[in-house]
């Protein structure tokens, strides 16, 4: 076996026949598998022990040699080597074919590699390979040309005609193609193609470029083209295609065995036919069948009908073993099932600390079993492991005491599926609980998106000290207070906790005991406990100064607010403490937003440990006082406004008027429909306003909605106002609204109308989940190798950050676009000229506020889009790590975080395509499909026309269309012919910028790239993606979207190659292109020219440098075909390829620079310590064993230092 951490790269190539024989331990000659009587493998069959090794450890087939002492002996009787049976997983065999056959990947792929190399069409190739036509190999003196196809009849005619011409040769089948491939002189071919390439144009040029790429690939990789035709095929080890006995004596076997048997049977039959000199036609048929059998083995179903097994099920071929969700890559290599794990239902744990979880005793015992056994032996409760095991199995009382001690400081990981972002797995300290359910802290539910209606969670146990350290320092819930997507607290209290906080900070006049004055908080608490005052009573209490200067003052507030402030830091900056050191920090009614702000301020000021304490305080206060408040809702809380009837009648009158105007022919049906919908929408608003003003402030329903605990104005409207407009099955708004509410009850017709929406809602949600998951998978794949690799790349590129607007609506302000980024240059105060922030310094909240207050509209900042790093990005271009609020560390896997941050809210985005006014027209895509459309750089539905020059607009109306003419300042004119259906959004005489849309709709990103260049398209994608997310109230930081765009724009299309050696027309890596050009300019040569290319995320994932990553993503066979011809080397730079081969990922603590850390130590002190340990160890044999290990480690360290 190959040691997995010792190799730097992995290469893939074509296997030559010699190579295949070299791998093999013997030839498989018979199709037999195992003997039906003895159940032992047949000799020379597919499971032969002589070839593949013994089926039982250290035991030969005939039984002459048993036991390990004969290791390495080959039995002279049966020929089996005495060794471990594990070798049956790694030893390969081979089959010598009687005739060459082609490899279907290289013949059938698109484009056909064999076809490109030979300059033959795939159809012609197929005819030759499957014995339908002859191909001329050497025309000799005939009037034929090389590679010409002949039918059997023609071939016979030519043979008769040129009997004496000895040179004339034509053949059929793979041997003919093999001969043609052997005749190719690659260098000569390359020279000829390069010459013809320069002079050709159009389709011909594209074809030549493709052929050039294949020829170049073969030259570079030193692969021989004739290896695409196989004389010998490998047989994979038997334990990878096992045969197992089921109860009832039948056998289950891997499909591969069937496919191999077909090949061997046909091969043996062909050998026999050749030996006895059968007629050509029979031999030919057998050769074709052999070719088809090998095709089915390699890729069943690629050509013709797939070979089927029992029940017409297509057999799984070698290619099927690799591709798709259940293939080798995605099923076994990228994610595996692990031991030391368990799962159970979750219940709420309101008494847990923020960093704790409740672990059922039985589960904990099973998970920590090895640790418990070790401890039992160590404490001499049990004398050996066997006894200790029995104690654990019997659940002896002593076991629980040991378990209690062991779980201290040993964090466990909790995971809830689906894990949409990194907060789906967090570490907690376990607390043993009775019962079988895991207890979860209520505040981490938001991050997990968990509720307690029967959700299950999985527990994993980190074993090694390193894993435990990472779990504690990086994954503990206290380190995950902020969400990585926007840097805001994700542990915000919800529901009961919000309600409790809101209730206890409510202020009411005229409550029991109002105006009482207390000497301190304790006296007030005593009064409250004895019911002299209520929570909402306004009282006065003497408070000490926050600045601890010994002064105090009487402060007025409510009892509840005094209690609430006890656990809250009193210097968060909500009160100016220089002027007022006595007031309460939070002297207002606390709703959900306010709680979030308090947590955010505490985190920025005190860090996570103090914040975790605060969270636990808010949690316990919230639960306690929402229980005391006992707020519930009843039918009586829903009051229907008296004015509702009048408002609806008024709307109906206006609609009758619109209907009359329509019937007179003054407006179109579409305009009538729009107007009706508008009238109803206004009516709904009026009813809602009447309802909400009618609701008293202390109405329980109102309290729940206003505080943010549960429900919204929208839901109250449906309960007490009117349900409003509904949509039909196609998603169009029905023009008759539901005027009743749930309090009054719906009529049959209203109920029927409302069912459309409900059913659509459910089916949309199901579809959305799948689409969102697939989008996340593609995003992860495209960005997985973006890791912070250096501190500063010293780039000279920047982006100009300004607020994002959509028409007049602000999508994102300047402040939120620059917080956490590094300034590209000194930013100056426009009035005084003093420097607000220096170049390469981070802009924090305070600086951003200052920049905005000074009226600065745009700022030059560093961005990942301008980072110079070839692999990954640098910390200065990335800026702040949103999850910690500090500068990002080297080794952070920011690509994956970006993908998760964009993908995780995907499920919240709507699926709806909004139709303009409900009449079926060209819909403008929104929601999730719009995000997908942008990231895949597709041509959008409802395409807008854009202007390619800056200038003034003139509109001319024609019979069939409108002409929009844009005239630039220097007199250049461009005419855009716009069909009547399109809605023009510019007016006569408007000034338009380059790339501005002239009509409604979405713009094709490729057009923006052409007109406004790379910067224009970057801004457009960021603006559009943010528009979709902000509409749903989801905040995502720009830098996540920028990372994806960086990957989409990582390639350049070469126009003129100059002295670079690039092929013009080919697509190359942007950073390679830049480096090559810089080098050429240094040497005084001609640099290459090219344009940025914008790829969709799927295409960008497949265009990655790493073939392992691409193959495990999609189109596995295509990727492997291409890369094996190129002889590609995967340098294992990204995360995915390292996961696949089982190395530590090059991110976090696995990054290469941490490998070389050396420990400085004072040799003498260490040696003394070891001596002391050794002395003590002589008393205790177990400790002795441990200390020798320690000293062994030190010695090896010293060797390294030397």
Curated annotation (Swiss-Prot):
A biological process from GO: DNA-templated transcription
Family annotation (CDD domains): RNAP_beta'_C, RNAP_beta'_N
Gene3D superfamilies, per the entry: 1.10.132.30, 1.10.150.390, 1.10.1790.20, 1.10.40.90, 2.40.40.20, 2.40.50.100, RNA polymerase II, clamp domain (4.10.860.120), RNA polymerase Rpb1, domain 3 (1.10.274.100)
Residues engaged in binding Zn(2+) 1: 60, 62, 75, 78
GO molecular function, one term: DNA binding
GO CC aspect terms: DNA-directed RNA polymerase complex
Chain sites annotated for binding Mg(2+): 451, 453, 455
EC number: 2.7.7.6
Ranges for region Disordered: 301-320, 1168-1202
Entry keyword annotation includes Secreted: no
Top-rank lineage group of the source organism: Bacteria
Cofactor binding comment, as recorded: Binds 1 Mg(2+) ion per subunit.
Catalysis: reaction(s): RNA(n) + a ribonucleoside 5'-triphosphate = RNA(n+1) + diphosphate
Top-level enzyme category: transferase
Keywords: DNA-directed RNA polymerase, Magnesium, Metal-binding, Nucleotidyltransferase, Transcription, Transferase, Zinc
Keyword Transferase among record annotations: yes
InterPro entries: DNA-dir_RpoC_beta_prime, DNA-dir_RpoC_beta_prime_bact, RNA_pol_asu, RNA_pol_N, RNA_pol_Rpb1_1, RNA_pol_Rpb1_3, RNA_pol_Rpb1_3_sf, RNA_pol_Rpb1_4
Subunit structure comment from the entry: The RNAP catalytic core consists of 2 alpha, 1 beta, 1 beta' and 1 omega subunit. When a sigma factor is associated with the core the holoenzyme is formed, which can initiate transcription.
Function: DNA-dependent RNA polymerase catalyzes the transcription of DNA into RNA using the four ribonucleoside triphosphates as substrates.
Name the UniProt record assigns to this protein: DNA-directed RNA polymerase subunit beta'
